[in-house]
Amino acid sequence: REDATYDHIVKYTGFLGGIQVLTILVSVVRNKLAAVLLSTAGVGLSALYQSVIGFLHNTSNLGISFSSIKEIAEYYGENHPEKVLLQVEVVRTWSVWTGLAGMLLCLLFSPAISYWAFGDTSHILPLCLLSPVMGFMAVTVGEISILKAVRRLKRVALISVLGAAATLLLTVPFYYFWGMSGVVPALVVSTLGVMVAHLSLSLPVFPWRVDLLSRAYFRKGWSMVRVGVPYIMATAVNMSVAMGISLFITNWGSLSDVGLYGM
């Protein structure tokens, strides 16, 4: 049994490692195409938007993507399918809640972020238009945590490839036809595509069910939030530093400098 377990670990380590290499290669191609089509200023604008999105998402997510794995995995390991299904519904419900919270944060802080980053309010509308990304990302991380918890590693690996490929295929046309004006729609559409890719592989395992008005789900999810808060605090510090560096470079330099820093 130990030999079989060891072989299983080695097999999937190699498999996931190969998938990771492929994903990195696709990301490199995407970044190179972005640099050619957008110039360093466009890359800098995209990087700045992504740092803001990342900070708001990780702050509003409450660590659900991290803490939810533990409870689902415990029920799955103990062979309690009913409890697994219930917990999956709780995770998905909380993912939607946190996604809506992230959208609200993005809308509320868009004026302040625009002023801090660019010294004026010219980017309020683009930042507001990015608010749906918060919802898409919340659902995405919820689905990947569910698949990890029930050990569907092949699906997790396939999702990584599909997500990278979807981002490449969906962003390049916007960059090619609209240049810097295509940065915001590219981010929205590519994030939507990644979410759809995740759902296409997770829904066959667990059909979509949420209850946004359930008090029971709200109470049951608090255990995940308590576990996730320390994780969120650490992540928020890291993300705030990354966003702060981008904002500093923008204020004291230019978007081209941010693009060069990110590249």
Regions found by a protein language model. Give the residues of each.
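Interhelical loop/hinge segments that connect adjacent transmembrane helices in multipass membrane
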Residues: 1-9, 199-242
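Signature of the first transmembrane helix
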Residues: 8-69, 94, 103-107, 167-168, ...
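Interfacial transmembrane-helix starts/ends
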Residues: 9-10, 47, 82-97, 225
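Residues that define the loop-to-transmembrane-helix transition and helix capping
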Residues: 41-44, 89, 124, 153-154, ...
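Helix-loop junctions and terminal segments of transmembrane helices
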Residues: 62-78, 149, 206-207
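Alpha-helical transmembrane segments of multi-pass membrane transport and lipid-handling proteins
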Residues: 89-118, 168-169, 176
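Alpha-helical transmembrane segments of multi-pass membrane proteins
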Residues: 104, 108, 119-143, 157-161
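Hydrophobic alpha-helical transmembrane segments
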Residues: 124, 128, 157-206, 223, ...
